[in-house]
């Protein structure tokens, strides 16, 4: 790479970083951190464990955001020094090191730039993920479980806290449905591009004749409700059913009727939770999910009105959005962005960052 090219490249990186820093507003983030640190130091912090958890989680996330931005700025500044050293010493090894670091910095800058695209009304929220098996019988149930593991591994690899609210197991293998929370800021904005129908094509391990099977699973991503959303639920409009929690194959995992199913009579929305130890805890978790679904319903109604005014058909999130092909070739492909990976095993193991980044950029383009 010529000296002039390097100079222009570094100027471009620095300019992009300045734009990112302006959008992130690091001074405001530092001020927010100071406020949260003061709240976290209060002796009464853990009097309300749920509020305390939110404060410490948000504090940790903001601190990581600032550290990440500061570290990336430092790497960009160090790059110019590294290239100068390579030029002055005419050292091929130093130049190779500098060019390798340049590639790595570009990638890190792209990832951070994606974060600045999460500017929607609910993008900064934590997320509720609901996965359900659709057409395809036992293969669909197995596929739904693979998707659950994929998202949980993705979160685990990044140190994000998750909480499984409910998992309904299928009789032979896999799951009928599951609901879990990803408890980190911007989880909703990041994961919302995953909403839609996912398709799996493979030789079915459940078919004695070894035939190719196509199965489907639906993914729904909801923002966690906050008090400012004013989602109020009248208890008289709820039907509450309690039952015994069950595990794989229908086996009971609890000797008491601690699982809770809520039916919101005006809308017909049904949610359930069985993973907590007590009926009270399960009902509270189920209420959180119900509130999120009601918020999403309200949001969709408002969007439909806006689309009608604009003459726009709106986003068809319910349509098929990604295919996972294991036979006759191996490929995972997003049907909206055309982003694809030839290693399905890695994808199912949580390596979905490329799909998320491509989806977020695609969504931003659709909004223009």
From Swiss-Prot:
Maturation and modification: Methylated by PrmC. Methylation increases the termination efficiency of RF2.
GO CC annotations, alphabetized: cytoplasm
Pfam families given in the database record: PCRF, RF-1
Keyword field contains Transit peptide: no
Coiled coil, from the record: none
N5-methylglutamine modification, residue list: 251
Keyword field: Cytoplasm, Methylation, Protein biosynthesis
Domain of life: Bacteria
Leader sequence segment: none
Location relative to the cell: Cytoplasm
Any GO molecular function: translation release factor activity, codon specific
Family indicated by similarity: Belongs to the prokaryotic/mitochondrial release factor family.
NCBIfam families: prfB
Biological role stated in the UniProt entry: Peptide chain release factor 2 directs the termination of translation in response to the peptide chain termination codons UGA and UAA.
HAMAP family membership: Rel_fac_2
Protein name, as recorded: Peptide chain release factor 2
Organism taxonomic ancestry: Bacteria, Bacillati, Actinomycetota, Actinomycetes, Kitasatosporales
Gene designation: prfB
């Amino acid at each position: 790479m010529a000296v002039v090219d390097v100079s222009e490249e570094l100027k471009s990186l620095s300019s992009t970083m300045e734009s990112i820093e302006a959008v992130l507003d690091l001074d405001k983030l530092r001020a927010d951190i100071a406020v949260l640190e003061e709240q976290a130091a209060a002796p009464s912090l853990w009097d309300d464990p749920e509020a305390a958890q939110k404060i410490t989680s948000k504090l940790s996330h903001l601190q990581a955001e600032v550290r990440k931005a500061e570290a990336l700025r430092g790497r960009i500044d160090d790059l110019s020094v590294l290239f100068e050293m390579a030029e002055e010493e005419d050292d091929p090894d130093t130049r190779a090191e500098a060019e390798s670091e340049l590639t790595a910095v570009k990638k890190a800058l792209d990832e951070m730039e994606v974060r600045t695209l999460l500017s929607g009304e609910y993008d900064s929220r934590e997320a509720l993920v609901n996965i359900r098996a659709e057409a395809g019988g036992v293969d669909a149930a197995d596929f739904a479980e693979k998707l659950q593991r994929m998202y949980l591994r993705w979160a685990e690899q990044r140190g994000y806290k998750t909480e499984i609210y409910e998992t309904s197991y299928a009789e032979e293998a896999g799951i009928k449905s599951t609901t879990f929370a990803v408890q980190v800021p911007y989880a909703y904005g990041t994961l919302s591009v995953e909403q839609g129908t996912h398709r799996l094509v493979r030789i079915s391990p459940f078919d004695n004749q070894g035939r190719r099977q196509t199965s489907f699973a639906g993914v729904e991503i909801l923002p966690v409700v906050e008090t400012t959303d004013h989602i109020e639920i009248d208890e008289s409009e709820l039907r509450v059913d309690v039952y015994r929690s069950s595990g794989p194959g229908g086996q009971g995992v609890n000797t008491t009727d601690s699982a809770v199913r809520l039916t919101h009579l005006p809308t017909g929305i049904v949610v359930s939770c069985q993973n907590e130890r007590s009926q009270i805890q399960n009902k509270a978790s189920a209420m959180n999910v119900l509130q999120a679904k009601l918020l999403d319903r309200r949001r969709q109604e408002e969007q439909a009105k806006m689309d009608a005014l604009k003459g726009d058909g709106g986003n068809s999130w319910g349509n098929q959005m990604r295919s996972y092909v294991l036979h006759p070739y191996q490929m995972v492909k997003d049907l909206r962005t055309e982003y694809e990976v030839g290693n399905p095993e890695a994808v199912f193991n949580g390596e979905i960052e490329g799909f998320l980044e491509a989806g977020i950029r695609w969504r931003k383009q659709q909004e223009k």
